[in-house]
Amino acid sequence: MAVFLSAGLGVLAPPETCPHPETSTSWESRLGTRFPSGSCTMSTEAQAMAEPTGQGPKNPRVSSVMVQLEMKPLWEEFNQLGTEMIVTKAGRRMFPTFQVKILGMDTLADYALLMDFIPLDDKRYRYAFHSSAWLVAGKADPATPGRVHFHPDSPAKGAQWMRQIVSFDKLKLTNNLMDDNGHIILNSMHRYQPRFHVVFVDPRKDSARYAQENFKSFVFTETQFTAVTAYQNHRITQLKIASNPFAKGFREADPDSWPVTPRPLLSIPARSRSSLSPCLLKGSAEREKDTSKASASSSRTPTQPHNQLLPAPDVLLAPATYRPLPYQNLYPGSPSRAGPPRARLAPYPLPNISTAGDQEDPTLAAGLGLLPTSALCLVSNQASQ
């Protein structure tokens, strides 16, 4: 029946002003009931299982139904801080997600599960940041169109509903009054109470006569919340990030939690050293030995006043920085700056310079790079003659 589909609460809006959900099917015409505004099952902090109270005589197929709220400790933790739910124009899912465990259904009977949201009062609220508290800001805005959200698996046998936890993870909240996607329309900065309904799909043709007997409503006070477009209480934001598995990116983005691994500057990986040629490896080892000898000798040398401004070069750079670069293997013939300095050969042999009293030692000239090796041999032969 259209009245059942259009509004979950008669005080919100007349039935003719509320649009039908997009997922309505032929079986829904048999759900000829209208939810009462005040008679529903209330849960308390000490009562995890909802019990029927004040709903009149019920069909045996719904009278024994009991509902348990999942994640109850998390809901209570949010409720102590003042739960906030984001509403957007496109629609936003609830967190914590409304999940229940159902018991006592007829395993062979068909049931439909749905939710609606009722305002807790006729006030509009604002958040005072200096006192971290919600304050009354005035009278409530005009009521939004009342809608109900059918679980997408409805209708289903009681055995299927009781087999697993029922989750309303597809339910979305919006503040768009022109929404045509079937989302629940709420006013921002208003407080709401979710309600859960179990409806027996009566196969009788005159099921409209028994409409008030074929449903049972449940209310969990710890699930009430304030609709907001952005979180007001920073503690709510922190709790949602910490408990929401889909907020993993926010937790990893915290710079304080990044691991700090010290890495040496200008270091060369070990495997790149193995790719060098044997000649370069040998030259690198010799230079490392020379560097260590130079550092040892410098430690024994007394410090000069003019050398106290800057440390020795081998202290500024680690020995590993003197290794040849990997690209030098690609061009074997190219000169390498990292190698030992080579004496430049003279373009022509120098004459044997002699003085009046003595003759200059040719080995000294060769050692200074003034004479090539061939010239050194020639001068030695002449001296022996």
From Swiss-Prot:
The keyword Nucleus applies. It is found in: Nucleus. InterPro entries: p53-like_TF_DNA-bd_sf, T-box_DNA-bd, T-box_sf, TF_T-box, TF_T-box_CS. GO terms for molecular function: DNA-binding transcription factor activity; RNA polymerase II cis-regulatory region sequence-specific DNA binding. GO terms for cellular component: nucleus. Residues 69-252 bind DNA. Its main location: nucleus. Gene3D superfamilies: Transcription factor, T-box. PROSITE patterns: TBOX_1, TBOX_2, TBOX_3. Residues 293-307 have a biased composition (Polar residues). GO terms for biological process: positive regulation of DNA-templated transcription. Residues 283-310, 328-359 are annotated as: Disordered. Keywords: DNA-binding, Nucleus, Transcription, Transcription regulation. The keyword Chaperone does not apply. SUPFAM superfamilies: p53-like transcription factors. Residues 331-347 have a biased composition (Low complexity). It holds the Pfam family T-box. Probable transcriptional regulator involved in developmental processes. It is linked to Defects in Tbx10 are the cause of a cleft lip and palate (CL/P) phenotype called Dancer (Dc). The defect is caused by a gain of function. This is T-box transcription factor TBX10.
